[in-house]
Every structure is written in C-alpha cells, then in structure tokens.
Design a protein with these regions (language model features):
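ATP-dependent small-molecule kinase phosphotransfer cores
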Residues: 38-99, 105-109
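Extreme N-terminal, non-catalytic leader segments
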Residues: 1-8, 31
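P-loop (Walker A) phosphate-binding loop of NTP-binding proteins
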Residues: 12-14
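Conserved phosphate-donor/acceptor-positioning beta-strand/loop module used by diverse small-molecule
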Residues: 99-104, 113-137, 168-169
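Post-Walker A helix-loop "phosphate-sensing" segment adjacent to the P-loop in P-loop NTPases
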Residues: 28-36
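NTP-dependent small-molecule kinase module
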Residues: 158-206
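Post-Walker A alpha-helix
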Residues: 22-23
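Conserved lysine of the Walker
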Residues: 19
Length: 206
C-alpha cells in the first residue's frame, strides 16, 4: 500500500452492488488499513458480530450520540439509523493509518462536508439485472423488501457523479484491484470525470 499521508476513503454503493464483499477483500489483502465500524439501530444478522460489522445500538442511544456531536455522519435507511463515530476515525488518522468507511451516498455527502480531504468512491453493479439477482441470492429478504431495495438502489445510482472515483463491480478480482489502486493513489482510470468511464456507465445507468 501507499506511504501517502493518512486519508479517509469513503466507499458507497447501492444495495446489492457488492460493496461489503469488496471492502472485506480489500482489508484482508491490506492489513494496514483501518475499518471504521458504524453504529446502527437495525437488527443484527446471524452472520454479523457486534463491534466488527457494526455497533448495534437502540434508537435512544443512537440519538444520544447524534445529539452529543459524536457522529461524523448519520442517515436513515429502510427505517433504520446508521452513523459513523467521529472519534474512531480521527484516532486512526492521527496514528497515520488510512481509514476505510463503508456507508451510503447520503452519509458520504455529509462526510465530504465535514472532511473535504476525504476520497470518495462509488461502487456500481454491471447491470440492473445483476443487481436484482444479487439481492435475491442473499436469501435474507422477502420479495417485497427486494423490490423496495431495488427501487431504492436505482435512485442511489443516480448519485455516482458526486464521487471522486467509480468502480464497476463486474469481476470481483478486477474490482478489488481497482479499489486498491485508488487507495494507493494510482486510480486515475476510475476517476468519475474520466470520459472513458462515463461512456461505460451509460450502458449501466439506462
């Protein structure tokens, strides 16, 4: 990984784009990176661990954190609250470590306002049909919830041009390699301003 000064990398994506899997692989391959664990009020899934995947708290505790200014950003998604602890991020950066923050586009917008020096990355699926397949393959949601998530995801994807970089998660190995390149300061091919990338996105965002 790069020896560049510590940066905060904000990674967002529509539901089902493979963001969580990409971030997991990135962290496994680069143990020097720090993962910012977010707070949430949603129910813990069977495979999740408190303090590793999220800090699971009730609504009252979440609102206390928000009121006390302890959250760098917060958002409400599908009726659940999500937020990033400010002190955790700042401590990692002060130690000289890159920090990876996995959130939604709303939270990313707030983080950019609070920390303009952050690097923002948006993950896209290769096609709408692939997004729908991935959501169904999770096996955790009803058809009604999947339909709602798909509709929400389509709206989320319209915000891609707010981000510094865009990665299309078609091939997992290629996508994580592109993510590593961005963190390493060598991801120019994935800049959202790239004409070649914009042309590629036209076929996805129709």
């Amino acid at each position: 990984m790069s020896s560049n000064p510590a940066r905060l990398f904000v990674i967002a994506a529509p539901s089902g784009a493979g963001k969580t899997t990409l971030v997991k692989l990135l962290l496994e391959r680069n143990p020097g990176l720090e993962f910012s664990v977010s707070y949430t009020t949603r129910e813990k899934r069977k495979t999740e661990v408190d303090g590793r995947d999220y800090f699971f708290v009730d609504k009252e505790r979440f609102l206390e954190l928000k009121e006390d200014g302890e959250l760098l950003e917060s958002a409400q998604v599908f009726g659940n609250h999500y937020g990033t602890g400010r002190s955790q991020v700042e401590q990692h950066l002060e130690k000289g470590n890159h920090v990876i923050l996995e959130i939604d586009w709303q939270g990313a917008r707030q983080v950019r306002e609070s920390m303009p020096d952050c690097v923002s990355i948006f993950i896209l699926p290769p096609a709408r049909e692939e997004l729908e397949r991935r959501l169904k393959d999770r096996g955790t949601d009803s058809d009604e919830v999947i339909a709602r998530r798909l509709q929400e995801a389509e709206g989320d994807m319209t915000h891609w041009d707010e981000f510094d970089f865009v990665i299309v998660n078609d091939d997992l190995d290629i996508a994580v390699g592109e993510l590593e390149a961005v963190v390493d300061g060598k991801g120019d091919a994935n800049r959202s301003s790239s004409p070649e990338l914009r042309q590629k996105l036209e076929s996805i965002l129709v």
